[in-house]
Amino acid sequence: MISGLKGILRKLEVGFVHIETGGITYEVTISFKTYLELKNLPLLKEVQLQIFHSINERGQKLFGFLTEQDKEFFKVMKGLQGIGELTALKILSFFSAEDLYRIVQSGEVKELEKIPKVKGKTSEKIFFEVKQNLKKLELFLSGSSKESSVILTSLLQSPEEMAFSKKRETVILGLVQLGFEEKTASKEVDKVLKIFSSNDPGEIIREILKSL
């Protein structure tokens, strides 16, 4: 089983990264959050990822995370009934464990619909499963390390700046899921956010689509 990879960054796209180590190049599936944290690195830069090695009847797949905390959160999510690996990865793209705990405690099911293609019964299913297993999430939160590659950024940003950055990333991911190139999505989001104010990513996406 592969539990970690350290090697040369060969290719990076939304959804996956290629890492070369020991003369072998591995394709690793990543969340949009991890993509954003890696995208400013130059190719051939050495990177290290925590790996969850999935093996089932359909084959093998590597899922990569920048921190052990993210990897463990992924394992908690995919272990819930009806939430597979790809849905768990989508959850990580949009929400931290703290976010998810807050959503379930407050009953804000609609918050989960920020995830592309997660609507109605799907969001309700995720909400129900997390609520039924809230103790697992509490144990994860109480035992998880506070170390993270984004802590420094968080300390340097005001709450307003952090909220804006998260909203922007959510809208970009939504556009990417609709088929936009990440660079084009970023450009369109920045353009619309200068003239359109809303805290609802769905409204911002609709405004962008109207302006095209």
Swiss-Prot record:
InterPro entries: DNA_helicase_Holl-junc_RuvA_I, NA-bd_OB-fold, RuvA, RuvA_2-like, RuvA_C, RuvA_C_sf. The keyword Transmembrane helix does not apply. Has three domains with a flexible linker between the domains II and III and assumes an 'L' shape. Domain III is highly mobile and contacts RuvB. Homotetramer. Forms an RuvA(8)-RuvB(12)-Holliday junction (HJ) complex. HJ DNA is sandwiched between 2 RuvA tetramers; dsDNA enters through RuvA and exits via RuvB. An RuvB hexamer assembles on each DNA strand where it exits the tetramer. Each RuvB hexamer is contacted by two RuvA subunits (via domain III) on 2 adjacent RuvB subunits; this complex drives branch migration. In the full resolvosome a probable DNA-RuvA(4)-RuvB(12)-RuvC(2) complex forms which resolves the HJ. Residues 146-162 are annotated as: Flexible linker. Residues 163-212 are annotated as: Domain III. One of its GO terms (biological process) is DNA recombination. Residues 1-66 are annotated as: Domain I. It is found in: Cytoplasm. Its main location: cytoplasm. SUPFAM superfamilies: DNA helicase RuvA subunit, C-terminal domain, Nucleic acid-binding proteins, RuvA domain 2-like. GO terms for cellular component: cytoplasm; Holliday junction helicase complex; Holliday junction resolvase complex. GO terms for molecular function: ATP binding; four-way junction DNA binding; four-way junction helicase activity. Coiled coil: none annotated. The keyword Phosphoprotein does not apply. Residues 67-145 are annotated as: Domain II. The gene is ruvA. This is Holliday junction branch migration complex subunit RuvA. Keywords: Cytoplasm, DNA damage, DNA recombination, DNA repair, DNA-binding. It comes from the Bacteria. The RuvA-RuvB-RuvC complex processes Holliday junction (HJ) DNA during genetic recombination and DNA repair, while the RuvA-RuvB complex plays an important role in the rescue of blocked DNA replication forks via replication fork reversal (RFR). RuvA specifically binds to HJ cruciform DNA, conferring on it an open structure. The RuvB hexamer acts as an ATP-dependent pump, pulling dsDNA into and through the RuvAB complex. HJ branch migration allows RuvC to scan DNA until it finds its consensus sequence, where it cleaves and resolves the cruciform DNA. Belongs to the RuvA family.
